[in-house]
Amino acid sequence: MMNMQIRMFVRQWTLAISMIAGISSYFILKWLPLGNDAHSLMLQGVHIVQPILIFLMLFLTFCRVHPSQLRLSRWQIWNLLLQTGMFLLLCLLLIIFPETSFRVEIEGALLCFICPTATAAVVVTSKLGGRAGTTTTYTLLINLCVAILVPLLVPAVHPQQGMTFTHAFCVVLSKVFPLLLCPIIAAELLRRISPSITSRLASYKDLPFHLWAIALALALAVTTRSLINSHVSVGVAAGVAVASLLACIIQFGIGRMAGSKYGDPISAAQSCGQKNTVFAIWMGYTFLTPVTSLAGGFYSIWHNVYNSWQLAQMKKKNTDAGAK
């Protein structure tokens, strides 16, 4: 009984536990007398492990999805136009006004808009009564768009010193494209080669969730390091928080509106609003101003708070209906 209660508590508060673990681990390691070499080695380790975790999360998710489950809908077009359109607009702003005093906030917002759908979105969509097939299809579509657009525009938005656009494009492409598309290809190949192994992997339903918790903790440790070392002001941090909140409200709101037109508001809202924030954090500290990775951390709070509220409302509604 006690073990069950502990498991329920950990699962219910995984977000908070991961965030606290990630933030506190940075300060603990900083205070330990390990030396700069050890700290640098651990940071390099995180940079290697983080993409692997993201890859595995996506791979295990796509192992559970059979091509016959995929469903196209017109709302997916509107969601794609919103995400890619806002990303293009914000990139254009930074290219035209590179010295703007709101650069960090704009970078944070563009991260939140282009960030692909979370692997957990299918689960939440199903619990809220939406269609898992259309959500999964949108996850594939937005991953394809991100894999193409990010390498094309990020080098122009945040040029690397001493690196040509072509070189920067190839560097970003080599990191983003395999990370988002290889899990899809690998899952489909495994399904064709060994359906039994694919089914076995798909049976571990909680594994992507646990990998996400580890990846989130590592991402927040790196984000905390970036925040401390950048000496960013409270005002800038608050600006990034507001930018991520607005991006969250806009995407959930417009996603729901688009889905309502085609009888699928829950799936459309979750597909557009629930994000793979670990990817956003990784992209922020890897390709943009490191402090912009805060946007992913804040967004993780906003979308999880909103979904927790939705699930609580649904549970209350079902309880009331059962009482009648």
Residue ranges and their predicted role:
Residues 1-324:
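Alpha-helical transmembrane segments of multi-pass small-molecule/ion transporters
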